[in-house]
Structures are given as structure tokens and as C-alpha cells.
Amino acid sequence: MSELSESGSYNSYNSLSAGSPLPLQEIFNGAETKCQSHYLQSRINTNYEQVKQQLKESAEKKNSSKIYSSLQHLTYYKVEKDLLETILRIIDITDDKKTLRLAYYFLGEISQFKHLINNSTEIKNITTIFNKEMQHKDISRKVVSLKTTASVAPNDVLIDANILDVISGILRKVGEDPDKTQKKKGFFTRATTDLGRERSLLQYSCFVACRNRYKNNPSLFMPIVEGIKCVDPVGARHAVSLTLNYALENPSTVAATTKRFIPLLKANKGKEAVYLVDPFARRNFIKLCGHLAATPSPIGNVITMENKDFFQSLCQSVMDAHLSVAFYAINVLSRFSWPTLESAHIDAIQFDSELPHFESLAFQTSLIVGICNKMRIGFNTYSIGAYSNYSMQHGHHHLHHYHQGGSGTVGGSVPSSSSSSSSSSNITTSALSSGSSSNSSLSSQQLLLVQQQQQQLLHQQSNPFLHLACKLISVLSQSYVKYSYPKDSTTQQPIIGDWSFDEKQYQHQSVYPYHHNLSPFTGLPNPISNNNNSSNNTKDQSTTTTTSTTSSSSNSIHPFSSLTQLILNLLNISPSISIRIQALKALVWLCPSNLDQSKLYLETFRSQLRDPYHPTHLFKELFLELYKRIIATPILSPMILELVYDWIDIIPSKCDTSLVCEIWKTIVEFGKVFANEKLLASIFKILDRIVHPDFRVLAMEIQKDIIKFLGEYSNQITFEQPSRFEQCKSRSGSNQQQHLSNMSLNSIIQRLQQYSIFSPWQIRLESIDSLAKIAFQSSTVVKVHIYNFLTLLPNESHGWTTVKSNTSIIVNTLDQLLTCRAKWLPLFKSSDLSQNQIKDLKNDHTNLCLQIGLFFDQLSFDYLPLGIESKKYLGSK
């Protein structure tokens, strides 16, 4: 690429050619004036300053051809404010439409410098040119002048008054025109003559000018609201948007004014109901209705008599023939509460030539049913292309399959989402099967026909629609699930439910190898799984009383269950990862709140885990949605624990252990014994799994994160409290027999001790840290046990220097803790402490908290290392 000539150099700037790259900062510094086209730079010998000078000279000489050529060259540069006078002069002297088009384009570009236009001469010139243009006979010049001037003119009282006067004159209603020039009815709606068409264009320009300059001007309120009936489609779109701006500030006034425009409202039959041709205008009107319908009432956020008509308009808009408009209405409806949606309906719709964009509806139907039907229509229309796209990507395989007499389906089964989808996909099948029945191989003509049909189907694919459809199904299903799931009568939180469904799955496995017949949390015999109504001390009474409620709610039919197969088909036919993610999110909320009925979804999610081509972020999105699901419906936690195991076992390289730990933390926070049993069983199952040699490094990193989790949450999982077994007579383990009262914690400690001896040094280091965290948060007998273990820990292995150093710190801290505990416990129980003793107690408490706090990300503010007895003396701390 050639450099610019010497006469056309960039001064301090170099060329932006691809062959001579510049430093990034230098490019940014020259961005305001440099040429924006590398191709132009290589073809012309002028720069921005030269083009600007040529334009000024041509305007002074009124040379039309040079003005036009200079404006053409200027299109490749970013203009500056100093061109304002030149552009205004060109508009004043020329009548050539091509030149005017470019001049107004650059005048609009200068609008970004409107805050710098403060010279009285510049303001006067803008006003003069505007007034002259508005008197011109050419309607197009009036339109573009009004739109552009409203953007570029600075905030000046005289300019505002001038523009408002022009807008008011154009939008003035019938009877308000002092010159009586407009006496026809339908000022906004009739445009059968040239005068009417010109009027509609001017109205359009007024609405655009108002959006650019006067969004909420009180004097223009009524003309703008009446402008919803503007015959110009785009003008009506802008009028609706302006009305929405008014509604944000004064919804009650706008609601009373615009209710008469609602289409399909019985009260508006034969009156002023608007026919919005433009789909974007209808979407804006739906947004307006949604805002007015959702306006809070004095009695709460419910649908009242004042806003029910707007809500009903949203329901009727679901039957819009344009799918984008219908789905926009569904999107707005999804923001309302589930009881409101569940009780809503769509009134019968008869074909009306004035409202052809609404589909006919013979009978009144439920809103949810109408939404499901519209979803099916959308999938029937747009998911065919996805099937075609998938088929084209696997073209040779499918052609060979058809030639051998195969069924011609993806994955071995015909997508059963709809009859139209099947029939459309069978076009290719029938053509190929007819060829295979008559000949042993497909002819070139048949192959060409198949490719043409696939290309036609490909044009019907709409990834944005499929993405939006899955997202709406997910949002609506989430609203239903959160509302219908049983809540606790006192806390109004989702109940934990009964997880005994898969008890047999774990009955043959020994999570706690030394106590097969004992409950790991109580040390008592395990209760019979079938006797759920018997007295069980390990389950809270609230859980047993709500089990029947959970079952009855879980067995109810999901209102969007009919769409499940459509979503499942997307996982088989859509090659788009974003659509697969949205489909999986929808399936998460379509899953029934019942462990037995969720098996299909469990296997579906497992099959996605086995797909080697899925990226990591797909699984993160899936498990993040599952994390939200167990918060809303804790009953599904066992299913999600199984999926977590598969995630770690099948694809450890794509596993996010931080998200896994958040899921486990949520289950711990349920605070139920049986929930913690299931969680601990799942964790031990992960730790005991057989690891493939190729994944040992990854497995070690995952194991470290799990061990860290156990160190932080073992006390919550096993309900171990520091206040248990306060009497401690020696460190020799005189109370060791009391370990059996908390077998789950004993099992965790045994595993961590094993890892501390026989594992690589990284695992040993993490295990010892976890043992320390457990000791600091546990009773004295546990502290003594871990202290004795760490003091006797062997030290002959690779990497022991680091481990030994860390262990030494932990042992010293535990030694101080136990020494202080033995010192203060007799004093706590004998008599009240003196002021000096309280001062010493506070010092010991502070020192221990500082040392122990090094092992935790954030130590609890109410942590008492010296026991619960010290609380009354530390209250004034």
C-alpha cells in the first residue's frame, strides 16, 4: 500500500496502512481526524485538512460538482464542529438532492458537538436555515430539516420556541387550527390524498424531533398521544414510544387517555381502536400496556379495574400473527406473578379486516394454553431449519444412512415436536427413499434436489427465536415452580421435603465402614426406610408433617410439560451452543418437583455430560441453573448430587469445583440431618471413585478442593459444637469413647488422617489444614484427638518440610488453646472472676482469635475459643 504524497502528509501522523502498523496509543490519539478507510487512503492524495479546505472553497464559489465530490471524500473522515458554517451554507445554496442528503448527514454528525455550539452567530444561522427549510415546497426537505435541527441545535430559548411552534402547528388537532386549513376528520388517520400523505410524513418528523429533544414536554402531551393513530407506520412507532415516556412519569393520566386506543377491547368496538401496521409499533404499544398494567395500585401489586384492560390487551397480543410481537407480549407477561397468569384468559377473536394482524380464536381460552400453542407454532416454524442445519453438517453420514434404507432422523428417532416439523423434515426423506427404492444409488439430480430443499429449510432457522423461546419457557416455568412448591407455614421458605426415595440406592453401600447398622449422626440403629411415619429423632417434625403436601404438589402436572419434547429435540438437532444452554436451562425448570418423575431429566443431563464437544461454560451454566433450582425446590437435591458426581467423574477437566462447593453449601444450610447424610455420602463416593491415570492431576486438584470444603463445613454437616463435652481431665484421651456419639465426624476425621499420611504432599498439606479447622470448631475431646494425631504424624516423605512447618504451627496453636482452656475452665465454674482475671481472659481470647483466624477466610465474630462459659465475661469487650 502506497504512502500519502508529501503534499498530503498527515503532519505528525503516519499512515494507517496494514503494512506499517502504529502504536496503539498513537492510533487512538489520531482517531478524531484520521481517515477511516485504508482503501481510500491508498487511492487518494488528500487528507482531512485538505478535504475540509476544498469543501469550504467550493461552497464559497458555489461549485456544485466540487461540493458534491468533496462531501463524498469527507464521508471517510470523522467531521468536527468547525464544519458547521460550511454545511449550513451548502444547505442554503443548493437544491441538488444528492448533495443535500450528504449535507444533512454531516449536520447530524456534528450534533455530537452541540454542547460546544454557543456562538450567537452559529445559533442565528441554524435558526435562519431551519425557518427557510420549513417554508420550502419540497416536503422531504421539511422532514429532514426538522429531524436534524432538533438534534444539532443547542439548548437555546429562541431555538426551542421556534421548533416547538413548528411542531405544534403540524400536530395541531382539528378545530384548533386558527386558519381553518384542516377541517377533515381523521387528522392523523386519513392519508388518501397527496396532502394527507405529506401531513403524515411531517407528523413522523415531529415525533422523531420530539424523541430527540422534547420527550416529556407537557404542551405536546395530547398531540403525541393522539399521534398513536398516525397513518405513517414509523411515525406511530415514535408516538407510542413518546407516550411510554409520559407514562413513566404520570401513568394514571396516560392510562385514562390511551385506554380508548386498545385493540380488541370490547368497549372500543367500532371506536378509536388503533391499527398499528408496524410490528415495532405494536411491540412498543405492548410495552406501554405492560407498564400501565403493572403500575402498583393502592391495595398492592395486583390487577385492578384501572389496569385490567391493559393487562387483557397483553393477553390478546399473544394471538398476534407476527411471532416476534407475540413473543414480546409473552416476555412482558412473564413479569407478572404466577397467580395472575394462571387466572388470565384470551378472549375469542373474530377476523376483522381492520385488525388483520390478530389470529382468529373461536373460543375463549386460558392464557397459559394460548402461550403453549403459540410456542408450538414458533417451534414448528423455526426449528425445522435447525434440523436442516444439523443434517447439512452431517450430510455424508445421512445420505449413506438414507441410501441403506434408514429412517432419516437425527439420533435414530424422528423429532416429535410437531406434525409440521416431521412433515417438513420428511420432504428430504421421501425424496431420498424414492430414489433408493428405484435405484441402488442416488442420482446426481436427486442429490441436487436434496441440497436445494435443505437450503430452503435452512432459511427458516431462527436462532434468536429459539433462544428467546427457551428463555421464556424457563422464566415462566420458574415462576410456576416457585409459586407452587410448598412453603413452611412460619418462615415461608421452601420446605426440604422427604428424600427417602433413593434410600435403597445407598442401603447396600457402606459409607461408614465400621458401623453398618448405626446411623452416622446418632449412633442408633437405622430406622426402617418404609416406616416414614414412625418416630424418628433424626428428622424434624416439620419435615414429616409436610411430606404429604410435597407429594401432592410434586404430582401436579406442570403447565408447560407439553413443551418438554420440543426442548429435548433441540438438544438433538441444534448445533448452536447458546441454544443448547438455553434449552438445558428450560429443562431444569420443566423438571417435576418429584424425585421419581425426575429420572428422565436426570438421564438427559447425564447424556449432555458425556458429549465431548460441549464447552466448559455450558456445564457451568447448567449447574448454576441447577443450583438455583435446589434453592427453590430442595426436594431435587439428591438428583443434583448425582449429577455433581457425574460431572466430576466423567469430565473432571470441565468441572468447576467452586460452583460444586456452593451447591454443597446450600444443602448444608438446609440444616437437616437426612440432607447432610445424603451430602456426605455423595462426597465420600466422589473421594472413593476410581480415577483414570490420565486425570490424576485434575483429580488431585478436585480432591484438594473437597478436602478444603470438609475442613470448613464438617462441623455444620455433623452438627458438632465446641460446647459439647466441656470437661477435659487430660490430653491422653480419657473421653475417647465419646467419639462414637458422632460417627459422621469420626468418619471424616479418619479419612483426613489417612490423606495426611499416605497422599502426595499437596493433599497432606490440605488435609492437615482441614483437620486444624475441624479441631478449632469442635469440642475439647475432638481437639485432643487431633492434637495427639498431629504430634505423632510421621515425617519421612517427599515434601515433608513444608508440611512439617505447617503442622508445627497448628500443633503450637492447639497446645496454647488447650492450655488456656484447662487454665480457665476451673475458674469459670468456681466463682466470678476479678477485674484483673477478666483482663487476662480478654487478652488470651484476642491472641487465640488472631492465631486461629489465620486458618479461616473469615472467622465468625462470635467465635469463643475458650468455650461458651467465657461469653458473659467478654460481653463488654
Swiss-Prot record:
Signal peptide residues on this chain, from the entry's feature table: none
SUPFAM superfamilies associated with the record: ARM repeat (SSF48371)
InterPro entries the UniProt entry points to: ARM-type_fold, TSET_member_tstB
Biased composition, class Low complexity, residue ranges: 412-437, 529-556
Region (Disordered): 398-437, 522-557
Disulfide bonds, paired cysteine numbers: none
PANTHER family membership: SH3 DOMAIN-CONTAINING PROTEIN
Record text on subunit structure and interactions: Component of the TSET complex, a heterohexamer composed of tstA, tstB, tstC, tstD, tstE and tstF, which may act in plasma membrane turnover. tstA, tstB, tstC and tstD are likely to be the core complex members with tstE and tstF acting as associated scaffold proteins.
Protein name stated in the entry: TSET complex member tstB
Organism: Dictyostelium discoideum (Social amoeba)
Gene encoding the protein: tstB
